[in-house]
A protein has these predicted regions:
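Helix-to-loop junctions at the C-terminal end of transmembrane segments
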Residues: 59-75, 368-382, 466
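Intracellular loop-helix junctions on the cytosolic face of multi-pass helical membrane proteins
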Residues: 1-7, 100, 104-108, 123, ...
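C-terminal transmembrane helical hairpin of 12-TM major facilitator-type secondary transporters
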Residues: 384-426
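Intracellular juxtamembrane helix-capping segments at the cytosolic ends
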Residues: 122-135, 422-436
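Helix-loop boundary and gating motifs at the non-cytosolic
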Residues: 2-56, 309-313, 317-341
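Hydrophobic core of transmembrane alpha-helices in multi-pass small-molecule transporters
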Residues: 92-123, 408-422
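C-terminal ends and interior cores of transmembrane alpha-helices
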Residues: 82-103, 391-404
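Loop-to-transmembrane helix entry/capping segments in MFS-fold secondary transporters
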Residues: 43-44, 137-146, 351, 435-447
Length: 504
């Protein structure tokens, strides 16, 4: 038995919630550096303040993936998590603009970023698996393309909203230490947008029950919990010990090499995973029943080959994206608009231009997902399509390094937008057709590790590199971003060899 084929409105309803989620992400990505700098953070403080975002994704997504694979109640399998995350994100978006009125505004803003990113991840992670749950294999590419179009459209609205408010007469400049009304109102609008969009998907879709999913044909078989326990029991703890040693080496390198203290977080995460790996092995050898830890550790160590090779691509792809989100505002305001004074009209004009630039790349992504990517995929296949798009994005980052004209940067954003569309669609379409249906949640959550880890590296190591070699010159980060996407494009050549000749 095959799943029913979804028409236009079916595809629309399945992914519309992502529109609201991406409004929230866009407001976060385009405005949080501005918020932090306005509240007194220096350029060197930004990576540490941003570290909350990837860290929450690293923790939240595998857990939510595991839980959603095993959830079934009146709301369904994935929808309970959509709704919970949307409510929490709306609260964080509402409270964020109140930071200047709090006794410790910078700490409060960082805490709200943590809550916001965790909440958006709670909503976002099940949406990735939701497309695979609801669609037959031959509609996976179309489903993720529609999802990407909504991501682009939501990001366009979230990115452009402060700029639109300014042109409607809302104040874009505020006293020192206060947020402009354009930013405040944009965050409150985002709170409403995410609730409305997610509620739409929750109430216009019906998830297939576990029994219905089991009856559908054409899905890759999943390892059962017993096989995972047996695989863990057969493992040696040397791998966990190696992770712990790596964490200790990273921690020692902080003092030896004079790295920023945020790098300690990376060392701690490596050591913690090593400990969890050893604990999971011991529990398996004792005959402990399958649990969340054994599932996450076991599935991580037993990833299918195609997922392992795509993980390398994701690592370099998201390194560049996080560099862009942190540094575009400082680069544009300093090099194009000539100001680092957050209370100046020039700085705020440049910060709003960043919203326009982010609107362009997200708008391009929305169009490319529906028009360009399907054409390229039919002509060259999904693997070569992704490689081509990443190359175009790398050229866009090079433009930021060399160009000093605000309008010329729009051309750069076209290449970045095409690459962004492909990053959001192609890897997930490939995975959804080659992973066990019953484990889409946990595998999509684990795949997020290779989105989060590079962001943590950027948030910790990049600050040390810039401080040591390019102090006060954030434009060099764009060269790092270009190199990262060039490496990702080359890494895609290894992916095709891991895709089975016959997919389910």
């Amino acid at each position: 038995m095959e799943k029913p084929r979804q028409g236009f409105w079916g595809l629309w309803n399945i992914s519309f919630g992502f529109f609201g989620i991406q409004v929230g992400f866009a407001l976060q990505n385009a405005n949080m550096s501005r918020v932090f700098q306005t509240l007194g953070a220096s350029m060197d403080d930004l990576p540490a303040l941003w570290v909350a975002a990837p860290l929450t994704g690293l923790i939240v997504q595998p857990i939510i993936g595991h839980l959603s694979d095993r959830t079934w109640n009146r709301l369904g399998r994935r929808r309970p998590y959509f709704l919970t995350g949307a409510i929490m994100a709306a609260i964080a978006l509402f409270l964020m603009p109140l930071a200047p009125t709090i006794a410790a505004p910078l700490v409060f803003a960082a805490a709200m970023l943590w809550v916001l990113d965790a909440s958006l991840n709670i909503s976002m992670e099940p949406f990735r698996a939701f497309v695979g749950d609801m669609l037959r294999t031959d509609q996976h590419a179309a489903g993720y393309a529609v999802q990407t179009a909504f991501i682009g459209a939501g990001a366009v609205l979230g990115s452009i909203f402060p700029w639109l408010l300014e042109h409607l007469g809302v104040d874009n400049v505020a006293p020192e230490g206060a947020l402009p009304n354009t930013v405040r109102y944009a965050f409150w609008f985002g709170a409403v947008a995410i609730l409305v969009a997610v509620v739409w998907t929750v109430f216009t879709t019906r998830e297939y029950s576990p029994e219905e999913q089991a009856a559908f044909s054409g899905h890759v078989a999943a390892d059962d919990d017993g096989e995972i326990i047996a695989r863990l029991a057969a493992k040696k703890p040397l791998g966990g010990i190696a992770w712990i040693v790596a964490g200790v080496i990273v921690a020692l390198a902080v003092d030896l090499l004079g790295l920023q203290k945020e790098v300690l977080l990376l060392g701690a995460l490596l050591a913690i995973y090593g400990v969890l790996d050893i604990v999971a092995i011991r529990m398996a050898r004792r005959g402990t029943k399958p649990n969340m830890l054994s599932s996450i550790v076991g599935d991580f160590s037993g990833m299918p080959p195609v997922m392992k090779r795509l993980a390398l691509v994701q690592f370099f792809s998201w390194s560049a994206l996080f560099i862009m989100w942190i540094n575009t505002t400082p680069v544009v305001t300093q090099y194009v608009f000539g100001s680092t004074d957050t209370a100046s009209a020039a700085y705020n004009e440049g910060a709003n231009w960043v919203n326009v630039l982010f609107t362009v790349y997200n708008g391009v992504a929305a169009v490319a997902a529906l028009v360009l990517l399907p054409w390229l995929s039919r002509r060259f296949g999904p693997v070569r399509t992704h490689s081509i798009c990443l190359t175009l994005g790398a050229l866009g980052f090079l433009g930021f390094f060399f160009l000093r004209d605000a309008n010329a940067l729009i051309v750069c954003e076209i290449g970045i937008g095409i690459a962004w569309a492909s990053i959001l669609a192609m890897p997930y379409a490939i995975l959804a057709s080659n992973l066990p249906q019953a484990k889409l949640g946990i595998y999509m959550g684990l795949f997020n590790i290779f989105i989060v880890v590079p962001q943590l590296l950027v948030a910790t190591v990049m600050g040390s590199i810039m401080l040591a070699f390019f102090p006060g010159e954030p434009v060099w980060t764009m060269l790092f971003a270009a190199a990262a996407w060039a490496v990702a494009a080359l890494a895609m050549t290894r992916v095709s060899a891991a895709i089975p000749a016959r997919t389910a």
